[in-house]
């Protein structure tokens, strides 16, 4: 019995499908290798960051001991970063502080943002002081905020940072591939801090456990909650996170 000949179009279609399947298989192998390499990079960076944080902490402890042994005082480095929380609503806000709150992206009560501390931003914070609480966040505070409340601004949408791929797609061109890269850039106020910080949507916090103080709108040093509370911002954020 004579074999059935396939029409030329079917032969071409079969070859094209086979070629497409081979290309997809090859692309999958490349993608898997790339993802494996990327995971290794992310893992190695996270380990390097942890060593960097630990070494810096030990260096400060040693410097304090050396200063004490020499009969002098250790002076902390000037803070480069603050975390700012809006604690007062929209009623009776003068135009200038209202504008500052808009510049800081603090458009809602209990919203929080990171701010690079400079002479200019220090002046802005003073103008908005009756409406905000701020201070110097530690690594633990930054990490808990980003992991628990972190959202990115993607096409004007608020998107949860549920996957490193989201971060890489938006910040990869700055070398920020993972959530630990993002935390490191914020904590160290790195060269791409502006891009990393602008990517972060303002944090939406809750009212603190037990509420604010009864003299909430007095300055912190007067028994209230507004203004610069330095390292004590970490306790407030923990209550609100």
UniProtKB/Swiss-Prot annotation:
Ranges in coiled-coil conformation: none
SUPFAM superfamilies: Ribosomal protein L30p/L7e
Gene3D superfamilies assigned to the protein according to its UniProt record, in alphabetical order: Ribosomal protein L30, ferredoxin-like fold domain (3.30.1390.20)
One GO MF term: RNA binding
Keyword Ribosomal protein tagged: yes
A cellular component term, taken from the record's GO annotations: cytosolic large ribosomal subunit
InterPro entries: Ribo_uL30_ferredoxin-like_sf, Ribosomal_uL30, Ribosomal_uL30_euk, Ribosomal_uL30_euk_arc, Ribosomal_uL30_ferredoxin-like, Ribosomal_uL30_N_euk
Stretches for region Disordered: 1-25
Keywords in alphabetical order: Ribonucleoprotein, Ribosomal protein
Record-linked NCBIfam families: uL30_euk
Entry similarity comment: Belongs to the universal ribosomal protein uL30 family.
Name of the protein described by the UniProt record: Large ribosomal subunit protein uL30
Species whose genome carries this gene: Debaryomyces hansenii (strain ATCC 36239 / CBS 767 / BCRC 21394 / JCM 1990 / NBRC 0083 / IGC 2968)
Gene: RPL7
């Amino acid at each position: 019995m004579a074999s059935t000949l396939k029409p030329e179009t079917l032969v071409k279609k079969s070859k094209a499908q086979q070629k497409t399947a081979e290309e997809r298989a090859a692309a999958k192998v490349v993608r898997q290798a790339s993802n494996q390499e990327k995971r290794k990079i992310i893992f190695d960076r996270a380990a390097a960051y942890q060593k960097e944080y630990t070494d810096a902490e030990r260096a400060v402890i040693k410097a304090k001991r050396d200063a004490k042994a020499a009969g002098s005082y250790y002076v902390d480095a000037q803070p480069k970063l603050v975390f700012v929380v809006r604690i007062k609503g929209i009623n009776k806000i003068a135009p200038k502080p209202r504008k500052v709150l808009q510049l800081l992206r603090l458009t809602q009560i209990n919203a929080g943002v990171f701010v690079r501390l400079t002479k200019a931003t220090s002046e802005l914070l003073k103008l908005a002081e009756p409406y905000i609480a701020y201070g110097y966040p530690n690594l633990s505070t930054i990490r808990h905020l980003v992991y628990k409340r972190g959202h990115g601004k993607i096409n004007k949408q608020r998107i949860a940072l549920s996957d490193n791929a989201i971060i890489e797609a938006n910040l990869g061109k700055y070398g920020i591939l993972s959530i630990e890269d993002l935390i490191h850039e914020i904590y160290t106020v790195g060269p791409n801090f502006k891009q990393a910080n602008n990517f972060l949507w303002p944090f939406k916090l809750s009212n603190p456990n037990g509420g604010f103080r009864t003299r909430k709108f007095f300055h912190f040093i007067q028994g209230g909650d507004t203004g610069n509370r330095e390292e004590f911002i970490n306790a407030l954020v923990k209550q609100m996170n």
